[in-house]
Curated annotation (Swiss-Prot):
The keyword Acyltransferase does not apply. The keyword Secreted applies. Belongs to the conotoxin O1 superfamily. The presence of a 'disulfide through disulfide knot' structurally defines this protein as a knottin. GO terms for molecular function: sodium channel inhibitor activity; toxin activity. Keywords: Cleavage on pair of basic residues, Disulfide bond, Ion channel impairing toxin, Knottin, Neurotoxin, Presynaptic neurotoxin, Secreted, Signal, Toxin, Voltage-gated sodium channel impairing toxin. Residues 23-49 form a propeptide. Found in the dissected venom (DV), but not in the injectable (milked) venom (IV). Pfam families: Conotoxin. Delta-conotoxins bind to site 6 of voltage-gated sodium channels (Nav) and inhibit the inactivation process. One of its GO terms (cellular component) is host cell presynaptic membrane. It is found in: Secreted. This is Delta-conotoxin-like CnVIA.
């Protein structure tokens, strides 16, 4: 019984993890080539060259603490210790 409950929780967690970390699939594979050509013509349009702003304290950060200005994400919220 306990093993069954643990397996159900693990499957639900992994399913949620897949949805949270998945890329936006609306573009699909058919649009990858035009985007790549555009990025080759204009290297500044590349995602790797974009600078993202950090999230302030109290904002939702998901599972990536690097998005917070303080680099501290606990329970999906950016925190700051002072």
């Amino acid at each position: 019984m306990k093993l069954t409950c643990m397996m159900i929780v693990a499957v639900l967690f992994l399913t949620a993890w897949t949805f949270v970390t998945a890329d936006d699939s609306r573009n699909g594979l058919e649009n990858l080539s035009p985007k790549a050509r555009h990025e080759m013509k204009n290297p500044e349009a590349s995602k790797s060259n974009k600078r993202y702003e950090c999230y302030s304290t109290g904002t939702f950060c998901g599972i990536n603490g690097g998005l917070c200005c303080s680099n501290l994400c606990l329970f999906f919220v950016c925190l700051t210790f002072s």
